[in-house]
Amino acid sequence: MTIELRKIAILPIRFYQRFISPLFPPSCRFVPTCSAYAAEAVLRHGIIKGGFLALRRILRCNPLCAGGYDPVPESRHQDAKRVRSC
């Protein structure tokens, strides 16, 4: 999937970050926030896998989870690049 389609797919997330999120006090238990994680996951992994990662993250963002630093995992493609460049 092209990067342009991924950017279009994250427009609702950007809308949420800009217009809806500021109306509420910060409550995300993770760094980066769930919305930032979702946007990065979709850009890095595509709409389907990134959306799945974002959904898993949002479901974990609750009082039963400690939270903390939880970055988006690197894609296999990025891992392969790193191995080949060594």
Swiss-Prot record:
One of its GO terms (cellular component) is plasma membrane. It comes from the Bacteria. Keywords: Cell inner membrane, Cell membrane, Membrane. It is found in: Cell inner membrane. The keyword Cell inner membrane applies. This is Putative membrane protein insertion efficiency factor. InterPro entries: Membr_insert_effic_factor_YidD. Belongs to the UPF0161 family. It is a peripheral membrane protein. HAMAP family: UPF0161_YidD. Could be involved in insertion of integral membrane proteins into the membrane. Its main location: membrane.
